[in-house]
């Protein structure tokens, strides 16, 4: 595996000079763009993503960039990985609990808190662009958190059930 393709959820990237290694390029000139790798593709959309999802990514990534972000110690790294795995494998389970630095919380509570904390960013993006697209998409995400039947995974499960298709097929 080449050094600029190591797996991580978000990769810092830069187009380097001819013959320059990716890490050398980043060290020399900084991050030019990021590659977001842990976003699900929506199977019901021709491109896998639509404009509201792009607006949500704008909100989320801007919000992330504005957060204090110290170094992650080994214990926190392990907790993040456990939470990630739980959401991937059990994310539809009602009442799913995750570990935070301050104790356990449900996925629904944590997601709601995160979406609420993103509200000012969505408002600023909308104010700057004279529209309400970001606040609208934040509302759509809140609806999915409150009622998982609005998620793409719920739609997939409904189709499987309606067509009598086993999940493993």
Task: List each language-model region with its residue ranges.
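C-terminal accessory/tail domains of diverse enzymes
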Residues: 1-169
